[in-house]
Regions:
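Membrane-interface helix-loop junctions and terminal tails of multi-pass membrane proteins
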Residues: 1-147
């Protein structure tokens, strides 16, 4: 079990390092790929996820996948909380590493870049706040992700 938890921690951290890193590069001032666009970002995310799956094998890297695997009997329910904690901590460490790597760019971007764009490096929110529809969209996206 410890081996699996370490794999979840490292794979999730590496995935977030790719994903948050590309958004830092795309959004923050004076980065090499500033303004490179959405296609660059999603391609880097896809590459990062693929690399993590190749290196670490059958990892989940997402609590929704852990929940689905527990529900399908592929993982015991006793693994749910430890896996989610390992993934959460891995994501936190990956985001923290990105913040430290791009700290000078964050400082330089203050006042020059929309604060919402900077916040969206680490999180997202709906442009149109309609909670039932937002929930529906996330449900469909998660279902597609799980299949």
């Amino acid at each position: 079990m410890l081996h699996n938890l370490i794999a979840e921690f490292l794979s999730t951290g590496l995935m977030i390092l790719f994903g948050v890193g590309v958004h830092c590069d795309e959004v923050l001032t004076n980065t090499k790929y500033h303004g490179s666009g959405h296609i660059f970002a999603i391609t880097t995310w896809a590459f990062g996820i693929s690399v993590c799956l190749y290196i670490f094998g059958g990892v989940c890297m997402n609590p929704a996948r852990v929940l689905a695997q527990c529900a399908l009997g592929m993982l015991p329910w006793t693994s749910f909380i430890p896996y989610v904690v390992a993934e959460f901590l891995g994501a936190l460490v990956g985001a923290l590493i990105c913040f430290v790597m791009y700290k000078d760019h964050f400082t330089e971007s203050e006042g020059n870049v929309n604060p919402i764009a900077i916040r969206n490096i680490f999180s997202t929110n709906p442009n149109c706040r309609n909670l039932p529809r937002n929930f529906f969209v996330e449900t469909i996206a998660t279902t597609i992700f799980l299949s």
